[in-house]
Amino acid sequence: MARLTGRGGLIAVFLGLVLIVATTHSAPFPPEKLPEPVATTFKTAFPNGTIDKLDAEEEDGVMIYDFEFHAGDRQKETDIAGDGTMVESTLVIPRNDIPAAAMKGILAVAKGAKIGRCEWMETYYELKDGKVIKMDKPMIKYAAEMTRKGKTGEVIVAADGKVVEAPEWVPISS
């Protein structure tokens, strides 16, 4: 009997770990199921936006809806909290539109990696302990996707080139 209970406990722990891992990654989300405040913010901010990809995940205790979309020929992204607060807005830009100081920071991290898609990001709110907190002033950041030796990563730097988020190099999926 103790052996069966031990296995049951082990199975419960395993299932709990699977649940934790599953909930820490974003998952595709159907646009028709968006909470009304999120849908309203997106439609108001981007009336000509066409959603290409929509994911949802909990970040720092806040449900975030991550939109990848286009408006005309411009590729954009935005993160909107479940209460309808636009946390961040992103515009895909050419590499040469990144200011010199920011590009210097990107190149220092790249260390010979091939730089791909680049982004201009404006963050208006921080997420902390389940709360959406307005920043004193929006923060401008730049991101660059990179590849090297069969791996891909993304670096995010502040306008002055200081690394805000270092890349996590992961194998390129085929």
Residue ranges and their predicted role:
Residues 27-45:
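Short N-terminal segments immediately surrounding and downstream of signal-peptide cleavage
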Residues 90, 167-168:
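Beta-propeller fold detector
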Residues 22-26:
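Sec/Tat signal peptide C-region and signal peptidase I cleavage site
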Residues 11-21:
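Bacterial N-terminal signal peptides
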Residues 82-120:
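Long, charged/polar, surface-exposed segments that mediate recognition or autoinhibition
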Residues 1-13:
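Bacterial N-terminal signal peptides that target proteins for export
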Residues 45-50, 110-113:
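Sec/Tat-exported extracytoplasmic proteins
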Residues 50-78, 127-156, 162-163, 171-173:
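Exposed beta-strand-loop-beta-strand "reactive/processing" segments of non-cytosolic proteins
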